[in-house]
């Protein structure tokens, strides 16, 4: 699974996932399914934000080829992917600036158009079950919840899906591709079932003992959202020339 993750996801996403697991004292060599899940969640958060801006009139617009002369503000502030200290700094800054209620738990995004925090979920189970788990944990009507599944299903608070249909379709297609690639490598069952995951882990560890890992070729294409992951996180003047560059798993 670890090799698959490094092949399938952008190196910057992999690096952020590694840092997140290290921060919580988790070993990606052992928790390989969690490693894959974190990378998937990160990519969905970035894709959610990609190409969405607010123009001078305060309207939400989609810009794929970007006009460097346009004064555009990113519609979504990305909170996921930051270390906890910086993430809470971002949240506090948003609350102080917008008057939004401070959430009890760290959300994934903030939507400047709808003025609300968003919790993104990616599940291998039934979307309604995962949605209820999220809602029971957050216990706040102020945080908007949007759940995606690997089967193309989704569920959101009050059936408000925030994004246009095409943007959501890109996310669903990416998740379906990840599922298909996992299945083709015999990894999907272990990704879904904890019991199968333990069996696969023992098999992988035994395999690693028998042979050294070969060099891995990775995709260098970068999502536009990843290009703005920098210290000046809250800079509202950020503008960039964007291009459609969604990641695809390399063929076997």
Curated annotation (Swiss-Prot):
Pfam name, any one: Flu_PA
Sequence segments annotated as region (Disordered): 202-221
Keywords: Decay of host mRNAs by virus, Eukaryotic host gene expression shutoff by virus, Host cytoplasm, Host gene expression shutoff by virus, Host mRNA suppression by virus, Host nucleus, Host-virus interaction
Site (Important for efficient shutoff activity and nuclear localization): 195, 198-199
GO BP: any one term: viral RNA genome replication
Cellular compartments annotated: Host cytoplasm; Host nucleus
Residues annotated as the enzyme's active site: 80, 108
Entry superkingdom: Viruses
UniProt free text on domains: The probable endonuclease active site in the N-terminus and the basic amino acid cluster in the C-terminus are important for the shutoff activity. The C-terminus acts as a nuclear localization signal. The C-terminus is recruited to host protein complexes involved in nuclear Pol II RNA processing.
Family: Belongs to the influenza viruses PA-X family.
The protein, known as: Protein PA-X
Organism: Influenza A virus (strain A/USA:Iowa/1943 H1N1)
């Amino acid at each position: 699974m670890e090799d698959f993750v490094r092949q399938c996801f952008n190196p910057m996403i992999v690096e952020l996932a590694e840092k997140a697991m290290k921060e919580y004292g988790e070993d990606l060599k052992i928790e390989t399914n969690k490693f894959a899940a974190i990378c998937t969640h990160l990519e969905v958060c970035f894709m959610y934000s990609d190409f969405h801006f607010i123009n001078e009139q305060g309207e939400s617009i989609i810009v794929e080829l970007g006009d460097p002369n346009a004064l555009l503000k990113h519609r979504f502030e990305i909170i996921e992917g930051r270390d906890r200290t910086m993430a809470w700094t971002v949240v506090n800054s948003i609350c102080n600036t917008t008057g939004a209620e401070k959430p009890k738990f760290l959300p994934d995004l903030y939507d400047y158009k709808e003025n609300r925090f968003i919790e993104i979920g990616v599940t291998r189970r039934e979307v309604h079950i995962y949605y209820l788990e999220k809602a029971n944990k957050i216990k706040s009507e102020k945080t908007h919840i949007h759940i995606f599944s690997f089967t193309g299903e989704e569920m959101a608070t009050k059936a408000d899906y925030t994004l246009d249909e095409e943007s959501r379709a890109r996310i669903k297609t990416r998740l379906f591709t990840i599922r298909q690639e996992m299945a083709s490598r015999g990894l999907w069952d272990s990704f879904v079932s904890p019991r199968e995951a333990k069996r696969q882990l023992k098999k992988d560890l035994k395999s690693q003992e028998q042979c050294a890992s070969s060099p891995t070729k990775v995709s260098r294409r970068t999502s536009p959202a990843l290009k703005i992951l920098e210290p000046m996180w809250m800079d509202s003047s950020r503008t960039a020339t964007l291009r459609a560059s969604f990641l695809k798993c390399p063929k076997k």
